[in-house]
Regions:
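Active-site pre-lysine segment of PLP-dependent enzymes
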Residues: 10-18, 35-50, 54, 61-91
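Active-site PLP attachment segment
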Residues: 76-110, 122-125
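Amphipathic alpha-helix from the class-I
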Residues: 106-108, 128-145, 162-165
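Conserved PLP cofactor-binding pocket of PLP-dependent enzymes
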Residues: 195-220
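PLP-dependent enzyme catalytic core of the Aspartate aminotransferase-like
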Residues: 212-243
């Protein structure tokens, strides 16, 4: 599906035959950074109900919204047609391999069976520790602390770009652990210059579908990885190289 300022163009689903499901990141699209518009949320729910299809909702960055409360999940609107999917890979660490599914009742047994056939274990100790982390309230406190830190970093990045690179535009809403910068100039050349300075930045070309034209130049920048002590230097190095 094409993606525009309103998110994924779910109206395209009506023109496709034999589609049993669709994967959406309704809370925060990567890498462009917008949520799925309310009209399109309603449209995709209507499509799933009419066709008996399933929406797989990846709650991407749902816990990291900085300007307002997180957008409600599609699953809350229609739990019979939406599989809600989340993970602790960003809030804690990807190496924990902890994630969760909230399934329609009819899918619980086949999904559990299929998971057992393809994966022997999911780390029982890690699951028990995560359960205790959640029940004790520690996970919620951790999320609040991380949200405040990442909000601060994003605000510093946005302010620095506005101050030093007026031809560069910060795209997307205040959420997640990355920003997409629309730049004046060649994204590949900028990505190479940033890589030379050991800054892990990717051009939009990495994410474009081969059938989609080159509409704009941009780079995707994650701001969560640098340590607290390294953040200021990393930000300064980035800003010096922006066109």
């Amino acid at each position: 599906m094409a993606v525009d300022a309103l998110g994924a163009d779910v109206t395209a689903l009506d023109g496709l035959a034999d589609v049993g499901g669709v994967l959406l990141t309704a809370s925060h699209q990567f890498p462009l950074g917008m949520p799925l518009h309310s009209d399109r949320r309603a449209a995709v729910i209507d499509w799933a109900r009419r066709t008996g299809s399933v929406i797989i909702e990846d709650d991407y960055d749902g816990e990291f919204r900085y300007d307002r409360s997180p957008v409600g999940a599609l699953h809350g609107v229609d739990p019979d047609h939406v599989v809600y999917m989340g993970t602790a890979s960003k809030s804690l660490a990807p190496g924990l391999r902890l994630g969760w599914l909230v399934l329609p009742n009819r899918l619980v047994e086949p999904v559990v069976r299929q998971k057992g056939e393809t994966e022997e274990t999911s780390g029982f100790v890690e699951q028990l520790a995560m359960a205790e982390f959640i029940v004790s309230g520690s996970y919620d406190r951790h999320i609040r602390s991380m949200r405040a830190e990442y909000r601060r970093r994003r605000e510093q990045l946005v302010a620095a770009v506005a101050r030093s690179s007026p031809k560069t535009t910060v795209a997307g809403m205040p959420a997640g652990l990355h920003v997409m910068l629309e730049i004046a100039g060649d994204e590949s050349a900028l990505a190479r210059r940033l890589a030379w300075r050991r800054l892990g930045v990717e051009g939009l070309d990495l994410y474009r579908h081969p059938d989609i034209g080159h509409e704009r130049d941009g780079v995707v920048i994650g701001y969560a990885a640098p340590s607290t002590s390294a953040w200021s230097a990393a930000l300064d190095a980035l800003i010096r190289l922006l066109p």
